Swiss-Prot record:
Keyword Transferase: yes
Gene (name only): ppnP
A molecular function (GO) term: thymidine phosphorylase activity
Protein name, as recorded: Pyrimidine/purine nucleoside phosphorylase
Pfam name, any one: Ppnp
Keywords, in A-Z order: Glycosyltransferase, Transferase
Stored InterPro entries: Ppnp, RmlC-like_jellyroll, RmlC_Cupin_sf
């Protein structure tokens, strides 16, 4: 099931803009202190580095991703999630707007 709405959170008003505007996100904080980000990646192939482990949840569009140390591109679409280890990196290839929630930790 795709997350369509997130209630009861605090939203950081200023956007995080990466890769010359190809990725734009906003941080959200839940009442228990849990942090996530919601955003969109526009058509591009990008490499992201992680500090903490991440789960990427697709809420619209599609992508292909490749985890560090692997050679295979894996498709991910609406309703799909993929996990990225902490202190790692992943490549993401997007041909249409990819809307996501990034779950940290």
């Amino acid at each position: 099931m795709t997350t369509e709405k997130i209630d009861g959170v605090s939203v950081t008003a200023r956007a995080n803009v990466y890769f010359d505007g190809k990725c734009v996100s906003h941080g959200i904080t839940f009442p228990d202190g849990t942090k996530k980000s919601v955003g969109v990646i526009l058509p591009a192939t990008l490499t992201f580095n992680t500090g903490a482990p991440e789960i990427m949840e697709c809420v619209g569009g599609a992508c292909e991703y490749k985890l560090d140390g692997t050679d295979a591109w894996v498709k991910s679409g609406e309703g799909d999630k993929f996990s990225v280890p902490g202190n790692s990196k992943f490549e993401i290839r997007v041909t249409e707007a990819y809307h996501y929630i990034c779950h940290f930790g």
